Design a protein with these regions (language model features):
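NAD(P)-dependent Rossmann-like dehydrogenase/reductase catalytic/cofactor-binding core
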Residues: 220-313
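Internal alpha-helical scaffold of NAD(P)-dependent oxidoreductase catalytic cores
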Residues: 37, 89-90, 113-118, 131-240
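NAD(P)+-binding Rossmann beta1-loop-alpha1 motif at the extreme N-terminus of oxidoreductases
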Residues: 1-47, 51
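Rossmann-like NAD(P)(H) cofactor-binding subdomain of soluble oxidoreductases
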Residues: 51-136
Length: 313
């Protein structure tokens, strides 16, 4: 299967490496020193599951790759304006495009280029970091992707979703195919958008946030705001989507920092528009109040473009 990884950083690079390792025809789309390292030495994965080096094609542009069977989109959401047009040269009559981006806006944005009929939506649970150009380090063993159809008649489990699930499982990826891809995306978003907002606003990892009873209560209220937006949009998230969050948090190391907080502390751009901003805009359209998320959005929005310097806060 010809698979193109659009965004070959910590997440996309990891999954692409696993697919390449079992013989899939993978092309990484990357830039700069990371691109050069992949071309020269391959992509190194360091993991508790075992270290390995994946060797595959790597390109900066997509116009010479040709039609792909599958395109996996894993760029940061703030890069969509420049990255998503790179999908167009990869499209053939049977191309499938799977987005694994954070947030709930991605599938529509991808479909504006690829078409709804080609677009799948999904989310991933994994802890990886780009340690240096060409080197990705995994913490823990989670490597789960949950995905499915997000357009057309739902729920349904299509043949292409089943086929892609099998390809991923053969690469030792924990792939779950679902009948409505919107559900896992929103269920993760309920927690992620709130966590990223509180972590970014407080500059704290999850442990101190959760330990403070006032902060914890407002955090849960923020999750309920996001859940209300999901239901207003007709997404059938689980009835206990918020109630099960405390048990989930108890299993997370207290030192865990949201990726938005990491980016913020390094002076990088942050995904505030795709996370907190999306909740606010969708809530307004649906007539759902989101006062906590609106406050977090207002606090973080000035940092959207980053400061360009490490240690910024």
């Amino acid at each position: 299967m010809k698979i193109v990884i659009l965004g070959s950083g910590a997440v996309g690079g990891y999954y692409g490496a696993r697919l390449a390792r079992v013989g899939q025809q993978v092309t990484f789309v990357a830039r700069g020193a990371h691109l050069a390292a992949i071309r020269e030495r391959g992509l190194t994965i360091r993991s508790p599951l075992g270290d390995f080096v994946a060797r595959a094609a790597a390109e900066e542009r997509t116009d010479g790759i040709g039609p792909a069977d599958v395109v996996i989109v894993a760029v940061k959401a703030y890069d969509n304006a420049t990255a998503l047009p790179m999908i167009a040269p990869l499209l053939g009559t049977s191309t499938t495009v799977l987005t694994l981006q954070n947030g709930v806006d991605s599938a529509v944005e991808v479909a504006s280029i690829a078409g709804e009929q080609r677009t799948l939506g999904g989310t991933t649970y994994i802890a990886t970091a780009l340690e240096s150009p060409g080197v990705i380090v995994q913490t823990g063993t989670h490597r789960r992707i949950v995905f499915g159809e997000v357009f057309g008649e739902l729920p349904r489990l299509s043949d292409r979703v089943r086929q892609l699930q099998m390809v991923m499982q053969e690469a030792d990826i924990q792939a779950d195919a679902v009948q409505d891809g919107r559900v896992p995306i929103w269920e993760k978003f309920v927690f992620l958008a709130a966590l990223a907002g509180f972590a970014g606003a407080s500059r704290l990892p999850i442990g101190p946030l959760w330990a403070d009873e006032v902060t914890r209560a407002r955090f849960m209220d923020a999750c309920r705001e996001i859940e209300a937006v999901a239901r207003a949009e007709g997404v059938p998230v689980a009835a206990d989507v918020v109630d099960r969050i405390p048990a989930y948090v108890e299993g997370i190391p207290g030192s865990m920092r949201a990726s938005l907080l990491i980016d913020l502390s390094q002076g990088k751009r942050i995904e505030v528009e795709a996370l907190q901003g999306s909740v606010v805009r969708r809530g307004r359209r649906a007539g759902v109040p989101t006062p906590i998320m609106e406050t977090l959005y207002a606090v973080l929005r000035p940092h959207a473009g980053g400061s360009g310097r490490a240690g910024a806060s």
